[in-house]
Each structure stands twice: as structure tokens, then as C-alpha cells.
């Protein structure tokens, strides 16, 4: 059985790292999950804190930049963007059929600390639900 490659991609790696962490908890033995960003990768302690509420560690893997080779190798590319504050990246026509988009708020848009923390918690919950729904798609495929 060939292992599928699922690539989570977001602007600064924050939401894609959260998605990778949730996805690695799925019971899918034939799937490899990686994450990356289309802009400079950013790190924040809020990622670990939001995931630790669910006893999940953030991924230790690198942020993979979307190279032509990686995009071609991926079986599914999950592009996570905030439609209010970001523009989703454009992809070559030959890979459009393997791209899905999740419109999930960018928690870094919040400035005040209490609101930013609440936003991270909400984003973590939304990504968890999206990943769980993705599991059903992958099982059926």
C-alpha cells in the first residue's frame, strides 16, 4: 500500500502546524502529514499552549516551503487561509484537482493579548473539526 502525502499550507505556518498536529492523531496508517507556509514561517508560544489544552504536542518538523516538487508529490494540499486578511496562493493548473481550501481566521490578527489567546483557542477548535472531517474523506478515498 502506497503512503499518501497530505500537505497543510498556510501563510506563516501557524495554522498549518496546528493542522499537522491534529492530523497526526488520526488513525490513518497509510498517510504522512507535513506542513509549511507560503510566506516566512512564524512561531509563537500560543501554538503549543492551544494544543496542550488537548494534550497534543506541536509538530517538531520543519516548515516545508511549497516547491514544485513537493506540490507535485503531495496527494492532497490543504490550503488554510483567512479570506478577510489573506489571499490564497495561486497554484498551477495541473494540480488544482488536489487542492482544498479551508477559510480559517488568522489568530495573529488580534492585537490584545486576551483576545489573541481566545482566537488561538477558537482556531485550534476549528482546525480540529476540519481535520476530523478530512479523515472521513481520506477513509473513503
PLM features: residue spans?
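Conserved active-site segments centered on acidic
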Residues: 1-68
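Cytosolic catalytic domains that perform sulfur/thiol-centered chemistry
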Residues: 2-7, 69-80, 120, 140
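Short, solvent-exposed loop/turn segments at secondary-structure junctions
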Residues: 13, 83-84, 104-107
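Mid-chain, well-packed structural core segment of small domains
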Residues: 69-97
